[in-house]
Structure formats: C-alpha cells, structure tokens
Curated annotation (Swiss-Prot):
The modification Phosphoserine is found at residues 80, 82. Pathway: Protein modification; protein glycosylation. It comes from the Eukaryota. Its EC number is 3.2.1.114. The chain crosses the membrane at residues 6-26. This is Alpha-mannosidase 2. Its cofactor is Zn(2+). It comes from Homo sapiens. Glycosylated. The keyword Transcription does not apply. It is a single-pass type II membrane protein.
Length: 1144
C-alpha cells in the first residue's frame, strides 16, 4: 500500500510538472517572438524568417517534451529502486553549503549496466610483451657493450643466408624540424625549399633512387610557390614509387605533451592537404625524433588507415632488451584492447640515433664512413677519426664487405631476413652535391654486392613502405598458419633516456606558459569549429552572403595549421631557441584573436532572431568574448563591460555536448547590477571585488558571477544592466597577515594575530587550511570522513655534475627541498553565494583554492589555480606536492594525451628523474577505498615518489644547455597560470589482484570534470548597446545531451575540393570514453545517461536536418567499402570514430 501510495503521489506530481512545463514552453514560445515594428518595412522577408524559426521552435518543444517523458520514465525506475532500497536521508546531499543550487531530480545519472562490463574486463591480457613487466625485468645497470656502447657484441655465421638471402632497403630521408634553432619560415628559406627542388631533379635522373618525406607543413609551403611542371613531377615520382609521403601529418608531433584533439587535427590537416593537392594516402608512420613514444599515436595511425609505423627514441636499456629477445618489430596493441583490432606493426630502430653513423649497424665508427657527405674537404667529418672514401673500382670490394658486415650484424637483432637501413639526418640533401655523393657511391656498392652471389644479399634503395611490404611478405607463411612471427606488445615508451641517467623528463614541463596557451587554443579552435559549421548551414539556409563570402574559413584553416605546427616535437615541448618560441607564440596568439572573432560572428548569426537582418549589422555589433590577451607572452585579462540603465546582452556558449550548470563570471563597471534570463526572470548574482594588487581593490571594475544552465553545444542569452534595485549578493572577505585600507562597498575583516583555522565548504566537501592558506584536509560530506590532503610547494635544484638540467633533461640535485618563506604569506579568504576561495601570496606563486556552491559536477571538485613567477631564480624548478593518507604504495596512474590511462610504478632502482612521467589531463593515486585525482588544464611532468603523494613540476628556469643541440638554457620564463582540479572519490571494494592490471579508467565524474575544465563556458557581450538588436532566448542545436561517455571531439568543416573554401560537409568526430563504474553515481549532477554507444541520428540534432552521414577513417582518408548513409551511430568503448556529415 505504502509503495502504491508513493507512486500515486509521485504520478500526480509528474502530471502537474508535465502540464506546467508544457504551459511554460508554449508561453516561452510567445515571449520569444514579440512584435517588432522595426521590421514592417521588409515585412514579407522578416515574416518568412520568423515563420521558419517558429517551426524550428515547435520542433524543439516537441523534442523537449519527449525528453521530459523519457526523464520521467527514468525517474519512476529510479524511484522504485530507491523505495526497494529503503528510506534514505533527504539531508545527506544538500545539508550544508550556502546557496547550493539544487538540480531537477529527474536529471540524475543513469548508467546502463552493460556499459560497466568493458572496464571490468582485464585489458590486453593477450599481449606477449607488457611494458610494465619489461621495466621490472630490466636491471638498468648500463654496462659497456663495446663498439655498440649501449648494447652487446653481435656475431654471425657466414652460412646463415645460404637458404634465404639478406634483403636490405636503404631509405634516404631528411628530417626537417618545422622550427628549432631557426623559425619554420627561416628553415624553409635557407634549407627545405632546396631539398625539394633538388629532390625533383635528382630522383628523375635514376629511377632506382628513392626518398621519403614526412612534414606536410613544409611540403604545402613549397607547393604554394612552385609551378605546375614541378607539381606534376612530384605526382609522377609518387606514382612510380620513388617518393613516398610517410605519416602525412602537418608535423611529426611530440607524443608526450599534446592532447589527442590536436594530434588528430594535425593528422587531418596533413591528410586533407594531400588528398586535395596530390591525391595520395600515406600507408606508413615515421617518427624518428619525438622524445619517447605513446600508444595513443599508434592508435590514431591505425584508425587513420596506416598499416605500419616506425619509432626511434626509446630508452637505451629497453632497446638492448628488445634486441636480445628479437622483439624490435612487434604488433603494438592498446592496453584496453580485448581483441586485436588496434594492432599495428611497428619497427623500433635499435641504436642510439637516426643519423647515418647509427643506422647501418652496431659500429658507428664504420657506419660513419658510409655517410658520403662527410668526405674529406666537407664541412664536417666523422668524430671517430676515420673519414669516408669515395667508392671506385679499386676499393669497392673492401668497402662493400665492410658495409655488408654491419648490415648482417644489424639483421641479427630481428626475426626476418628483411633489413631497414635509413640514410639521412637533419636537413640532409639540401645541396645537390649531397644527392650525387650519397646516391652514386651507394649505387656502386649496391651493384657490386648484388653481382656477388657469394654475398647472399639483395640490396637497393627503398621507401619505408617498400621495406614494410617485404617484411609482411616474410611473415606471410607464418601468418597463413595463424600465428605471426612478430610478438604483440602493449604499453608505452616513457620516460626516455638516451644515455647514462639522462632522462628526458624536463621537457614535460619546459615553457609551461605555452603549454597552457596550447590548450586554450585547442578549446577555442574546437568551439569555433562547431559554431562555425552550424552558422554556415544557417547562412546557406537563409542565403546570408555576408557570412558565406567572409574570410572566416581561411582564418579557421590558418588557426588549424598554427595549432598543428605547435604540436611539433620542438614546439609544444619547449625545446626551441628563444626567438623561435616567440614565433610559435605569436602564431598561436594571432590565431586566438581570429578564433574569438569566428566564435563571436558565428554565435551572433545563430542567436539573432531575424537572420535576414544579419547583413545590416556592422562587425562592431557582433559578440565579443570577455577575455583578451594583449600579447603572445601575457596572461589573458577580462574585459570590463560598461553598464547603464539600458540592458546589454550577455550570450553564454557551452562548447560541451552535455547540458551543464556552470559559473559565469564577467567584469562590469558597476556593483549595482541586475542579470535577467531571456524570459525576464532575475538571476542570483554574486558581486566580488576585482583586486588590482593583493590588497588593493579596483574602483572601476567589479566581478559578477552567476549560475547558468546552458544546453549542450548551445547558446543562452542573458540581459545585464545597472539598477538601483539590484538583488546581488556581495562577497565577504577575511584577510590574514595584511589589511586593506579602502574596502569600498565590501565587508572586510582584518585578522592580524590569530591562530584561527581557515575553512571552506559547500554541500559536498569541507576543506581545512593552515595559517599560510595551504590546504591540509578534506572532509567528504557523503560519509563524514576526514582525509589528509596536504598541499605544499617545493624546489628542485640541478646536479653539481658536469651535465646539468636543461630544456630536455631533468637532472636534479636529489629530492625536492621545501619551499621556505621568510615572512608568512598574506592570505585572503572570500565567502560568497556562488563561490568561496582562499588565496595566498608567496614570493613565487599566488595559490588559489576555490569551491563552487553549485549542486552538480562543478561543486564536487576543488579548483586550484597557481600563478607562478620564477623569473628571478637561478637553476631551480618549482613543484606542487599533494600528500594524502591514500595507501597507494609505489603505484600511480597518468593519462596519455588525454586519451587513455597508463599505470605507472615508481621504481627505486631508477633515479628520481626517471620516475617523472608526462601528464596531459590527469594523474591519480588510489587504494582499496579511495581515489585522489589531480586534473590538469595543461601538460606538465608528474610523479608519485612516495605513497599517497602526487607531485607536479610547474615551471623550470635553467641557466645552461643540456648538450642536446639547443645550445641554450631556459631563461625566458613568463608569469604562468596553471589550473588544476582535485577530486576525491570513494571506490567500491576491489581486490589487490585487480590493482596490478595494466589498464585503468577514470570515473565518469572525472572524465566530465576534466571536460568542464578544459572547455569552459564562453561569455560574450555585444560590443555596444543596441536598442534595436533582438536575440533569441537560446540556441540549442542538440535534441538532448549526448550519452555521458560520448565526447564530441570536433565538428570540423571540410575543405572544398576546388579552391581553399569550405564544402557543405563536416567531419563529425566522436570518442566513446572508457570509464570505471566502481564509483558512486548518485548525486553527481550528470545530465545524461549511457546507451551502450548507440546514438539514433534522427534524435541527434534539433535545429538541423541530417542530409547525409557516412562512416570514414579517422582522418577522412578512407571510406569503408560500400559506404552508405547510416541511421544509427554505434561506438565501442575507447574508440574514436569519424563520420562525414552534411546538415541543412
């Protein structure tokens, strides 16, 4: 009876809610379209536009109604479950925390139990080689290996090739950094253009000659200045197999610090350029210079349709171990792959470098003699003291034997009789003389070797795919028996060391200012891409020529290319010359400005009530983002919105595919402010001081903050005005160890001598701080438990040995020393209705911890912001350490490229710097009961050197070069903003065996918190108050949120096949994230559910009709056979899938 009575009451409530909701929606329909006498002059046109909008609006109401019914159904299910579970305290979630915003109860998280199976199954249990195990096996003792210093002596029997000859492919290449010691443009002007020009001439001279090229950024720059004859010559060289484009990305990217969004984007940019200009599809990957290698890159290449890849920079001890076991060629499989769908055949180069002395065989003294650019009389020789000799009939026999001996020895490290011998180095084949020296001397050696049947060798120039095709053929017999001769490997190749204890973990943090700028650029680019495509389709629909004919798409293309260029392994890494860094920064800065314009223009068109009036507005009326950066090396500053009694529009964009309630903060000119929703409802506002200095309040600016509920990928309109009847809430301040002379309108309490503790709380957590303003403890309200979460700062110095830390290397002088201050820091505590925070001011870092009073995702984590300034220190690195009571032992977890989680072990047999790993978006530690996650809005180096600790290196200033070619230290430090979130989650019980798995997944809450932080809402104001301007209340392009575990990576307008303009198609890129279900999903405030990766196309969009949707390979290079329109999207966990979509 009790149950049925509850259902009766609940059913009645639902009926009322539905009726009231429908009434409100219909009422809002009228409110949205008031009569406007201004339109009477062009009545028919305006009326048509409005009629179309009304039809769209009714469709949306219908969709919303369906969504409400769906949510009610879920709520009934949830209610019945909660009744069966017994009564729950209604106070548990909402008992404390001033002003927490309650969410509608029907919008609770619903996870399909089938979606939990993936993470609960162990990943990659069928790998032959698991990198975590390899690190346990290797002793890392580094004995002298003889001529191959880091290896061992290689021997062979002369009859080993009697039955099957050795097949050698010599692959000429030139490694062209798009910026390092010179800028991209300077390298092109001085070197690269000559390589291309000579390539066309010299390859045509002899059809046996081959060459490979990787960086499309350079190829495209050259293509723009050459004539049609040269273009045809290049196409013909590719067609006859003499020239191969390898990888085909815009650059050869770093693999530690970039986010997968940018890795994919530069791959698409390169592949699209190749398709539109040359019509070629790369087959093999070539990564000889990135400083360590990520399985994320292997996955992306596989999904782009490449079948093979090559890597070079791997820890010398790992190379030796692989050489001993002949595992240098392997199928690289993702840790999470339960089958073999992600396998890609990978060749690891065995020796120290990709240069010629280290690629023909184990003895560099001999191999150097076969680099014919080093002949006597040239600009540089062989450091081993024996120069090359020009090949002639008198020495060809002895030289051929010497070279063949090296090839044979090298081949002993592999499982087949097919051998790769790269022939190149940085910016090689620049002079036409080198083409002659290398190709003519080698051809004489080849001709001689091939003529001697006793040598049992077949040798030739080849492309990378020539080599891999032969390798596949050698494995064919084994594969036909159902078992390849190559092992399966899972894991990654960080952290890289090229010799001794020289670990390349410094660059994980080097120049963090630009690492942060990179992520802001990514967020802006993605936001601009999505809004631009929606606006483009509406502009087509309403024939808005001003938008269609604008240069926005050209600017968008340039922004993609500038972001792509920055993913280069000497750019985002922070390992280029100072002026080259300025060049990269300037490119990013200019593109940021342009993207803000694209976002503003696109949003304006989409939110404009009468689309046909778009052409009549000047650009000054368009929406302007609230953040402005003055120069490439300064932090963004907020614009001040000038208020008056005349309302100003404030448009807020949610670039995420999830419905969200987020804080919106803008600066205004007056504290007496009112904010109204589009329907005229007043919005609760917190007014906070804008601080000109640590203890000086601005007299001209005030910060207003309010909660905004914004639809997925949508725009929400608010009105702000100055008003004496303001209902805003002023923040209160408590100051420790300092005081404010003029507090203005704010209540400020000065605490000079007090031992009183500092606390912050909301409805989820209570934080305790010490007198210095540093967090000491977190209490989770869900269970009332206190947890040690202790934040400290510390310094690393550099070793007293000859080799010291530099841009690449981290060589510390032992453990970090605590950050010591002479006078206690000034601490400022803010208590507000929307957020509260503690800010403490140290000499080198301004540290802010903030809690949001938002009942939802934003309220469950702790936001940490550090403004770091180490411009005056000498050979030091500053770190933030979080110490907790979590019993994590020596195990911790870091993400790879924001795509997947890689378990790590802190190994005592390795030096401290070897235990530092790259973190792109998150790192966590855990025990059987809890997980502590540090979410990051920028790539940095991270470690867990002791149980319960996470330490992140935030900036480094180093006075010397580390002897890796840069020839300078890092002394161009900026005032740098680092942004983090700390999330403490309760885990369901797990057994200890599960903790040893080679795979781990974040929780859904962690995933979405990371997305919220990396893709914040974007507030925009119209530049000038315009009384005649009318905007819709909102623009909501999706029918509902995408499933919780599906992320819209991009909606990227595809370039037209003719010219540089846009086509009508876009690349829809979706990522289904793997997540761990063993975390509480109650009260998370997620406005979505999971659907086993299924999305019905007809239920996807609201304002648009999907004209076509077809599957594609990741970078649009390939379409599956028999491709046709699909009506349902099906994504498997962890997969990133691209579709060609056309909307109208």
């Amino acid at each position: 009876m009790k149950l049925s009575r509850q259902f009766t009451v609940f059913g009645s409530a639902i009926f009322c809610v539905v009726i009231f909701s429908l009434y409100l929606m219909l009422d809002r329909g009228h409110l949205d379209y008031p009569r406007n006498p201004r339109r009477e002059g062009s009545f028919p046109q305006g009326q048509l536009s409005m009629l179309q909008e009304k039809i769209d609006h009714l469709e949306r109401l219908l969709a919303e109604n369906n969504e409400i019914i769906s949510n009610i159904r879920d709520s009934v299910i949830n209610l019945s479950e909660s009744v069966e579970d017994g009564p729950k305290s209604s106070q548990s979630n909402f008992s404390q925390g001033a002003g927490s915003h309650l969410l509608p109860s029907q919008l609770s998280l619903s996870v399909d139990t089938a979606d939990c199976l993936f993470a609960s199954q162990s990943g990659s249990h069928n790998s032959d080689v698991q990198m975590l195990d390899v690190y346990s096996l290797i002793s890392f003792d580094n004995p002298d290996g003889g001529v191959w210093k880091q290896g061992f002596d290689i021997t062979y029997e002369s009859n080993e090739w009697d039955t099957e000859p050795l097949q050698v492919f010599v692959v000429p290449h030139s490694h062209n950094d798009p910026g390092w010691l010179k800028t991209f443009n300077d390298y092109f002007r001085d070197k690269t253009q000559y390589i291309f020009n000579n390539m066309v001439l010299k390859l045509k001279e002899d059809s046996r000659r081959k060459f490979i090229w990787s960086e499309i950024s350079y190829l495209s720059k050259w293509w723009d200045i050459i004539d049609i004859q040269k273009k045809d010559a290049v196409k013909s060289l590719i067609e006859n197999g003499q020239l191969e484009i390898v990888t085909g990305g815009w650059v050869m990217p770093d693999e530690a610090t970039p986010h997968y969004f940018a890795l994919i984007d530069q791959l698409i940019e390169g592949h699209q350029w190749l398709e539109n200009n040359i019509g070629v599809k790369p087959r093999s990957g070539w990564a000889i210079d990135p400083f360590g290698h990520s399985p994320t890159m292997a996955y992306l290449l596989n999904r782009a349709g490449l079948s093979h890849m090559l890597i070079q920079r791997v820890h010398y001890a790992v190379k030796k171990h692989f050489a001993l076991h002949k595992t240098l060629e392997f199928f690289w499989r993702q840790n999470w792959d339960l089958g073999s769908v992600t396998d890609i055949l990978c060749h690891m180069m065995p020796f120290y470098s990709y240069d010629i002395p280290h690629t023909c065989g184990p003895d560099p003294k001999i191999c150097c003699q076969f680099d014919f650019k080093r002949l006597p009389g040239g600009r540089f020789g062989c450091p081993w003291g024996v120069p090359p000799e020009t090949i002639h009939p008198g020495n060809v026999q002895s030289r051929a034997r010497m070279l063949l001996d090296q090839y044979r020895k090298k081949s002993k490290l592999f499982r087949t009789k097919v051998l790769l011998a790269p022939l190149g180095d940085d910016f090689r084949y620049c002079e036409y003389t080198e083409w002659d020296l290398q190709f003519k001397n080698y051809q004489q050696l080849f001709d001689y070797m091939n003529s001697q049947s006793k040598f049992k060798v077949k040798i030739q120039f080849g492309t990378l795919s020539d080599f891999f095709d032969a390798l596949d053929k050698a494995d064919e017999t084994q594969r036909d028996k159902g078992q390849s001769m190559f092992p399966v490997l899972s894991g990654d190749f960080f952290t890289y060391a090229d010799r001794d204890d020289h670990y390349w973990s410094g660059y994980f943090t080097s120049r963090p200012f630009y690492k942060r700028m990179d992520r802001i650029m990514e967020s802006h680019l993605r936001a601009a891409e999505i809004l631009y495509y929606f606006a483009l389709r509406q502009a087509h629909k309403y024939k808005i020529n001003k938008f269609l004919s604008s240069s926005l798409y050209t600017a968008l293309t340039e922004a993609r290319r500038n972001l792509g260029l920055f993913q280069h392994h000497d750019a985002i890494t922070g390992t280029a010359k100072d002026w080259v860094v300025v060049d990269y920064g300037t490119r990013l800065f200019h593109s940021l400005m342009v993207l803000e314009k694209i976002i503003g223009n696109s949003a304006f068109l989409l939110i404009l009530k009468d689309k046909l009036t778009y052409d009549s507005y000047s650009p000054d009326t368009f929406l302007e983002m609230d953040l402005k950066q003055k120069s490439q090396d300064s932090l963004p500053q907020k614009n001040i919105i000038r208020l008056s009694a005349e309302p100003r529009y404030l448009v807020v964009y949610n670039p995420l595919e999830q419905d969200r309630i987020s804080l919106v903060s803008v600066y205004v000119s007056s504290p007496t402010v009112q904010v109204f929703s589009a329907s005229g409802k007043p919005v609760e506002v917190q007014v906070s001081a804008v601080w000109d200095t640590a203890n000086t309040i601005s007299e001209t600016a005030y910060e207003i903050s309010f909660r905004a509920h914004i639809p997925p990928l949508g725009l929400k309109v608010y009105k702000i005005l100055e008003s004496a009847s303001s209902n805003s809430h002023l923040a209160d301040y408590v100051l420790y160890k300092n005081k404010v002379e003029d507090s203005g309108i704010f209540t400020i309490k000065n605490m000079i001598n007090t031992e009183e503790g500092i606390t912050l709380e909301n409805s989820f957590v209570l934080l305790r701080f010490d007198q210095t303003g540093l967090m000491k403890q977190m209490m989770t309200k869900e269970d009332g438990k206190h947890h040690e979460v202790n934040v400290q700062f510390s310094w690393y110095g550099t070793t007293i040995k000859r080799d010291k830390s530099g841009a690449y290397l981290f060589l510390p002088d032992g453990n970090a020393k605590p950050y010591v201050y002479t006078t206690p820091p000034f601490v400022r505590v803010t208590h507000g209705r929307i957020y509260s925070e503690v800010t403490c001011f140290f000499d080198h870092v301004t540290h802010r911890v903030r809690l949001y009073h938002i009942q939802g995702i934003e309220g469950q984590s702790v936001e940490v912001s550090n403004i770091v300034d180490i411009r005056k220190v000498y050979n030091r690195e500053i770190a933030m350490k979080i110490s907790s009571d979590i019993k994590s032992q020596n195990r911790f977890y870091t993400d790879l490229n924001g795509y997947q989680i890689q378990p790590r072990m802190t190994l005592s047999k390795l030096p401290l710097q070897a235990n530092v790993y790259p973190m792109t978006t998150m790192a966590y530690i855990q025990d059987a009961k809890h997980r502590l996650t540090l979410l990051s809005a920028q790539s940095l180096g991270v470690s867990s050197l002791n149980s319960g600790q996470i330490e992140v290196i935030m900036d480094r200033r180093l006075m010397q070069d580390d002897n890796r070619g840069l020839e300078q230290g890092i002394q161009d430090n900026k005032i740098t903003a680092n942004l983090f979130r700390i999330l403490l989650e309760k885990r369901s019980a797990v057994n200890t065996e599960e903790e040893k798995k080679s795979v781990s997944y974040p929780s859904l809450l962690s995933h979405i918190t990371s997305s919220l932080m990396n893709h914040p809402v974007i507030p925009m104001a119209n530049k000038f108050s315009s009384p005649t301007l009318e905007l819709q209340g909102e623009f909501s392009p999706l029918q509902s949120s995408l499933p919780c575990d599906i992320h819209l990576v991009n909606l990227r307008t595809i370039q037209s096949k003719v010219g540089n303009g846009h086509s009508n198609e876009a690349a829809l890129i979706l990522h289904r994230k793997g997540f761990d279900c063993r975390f509480s999903s109650k009260g998370t405030g997620l406005f979505c559910s999971t659907t086993q990766g299924k999305i019905l196309v007809q239920k996807l969009l609201n304002k648009f009709i999907v004209e076509s949707l077809t599957p594609s390979s990741l970078s649009l290079m390939h379409s599956p056979p028999g491709t046709q329109n699909i009506s349902e999207i099906n994504l498997s966990p962890m997969e990133i899938s691209t579709f060609r979509i056309q909307l109208r």
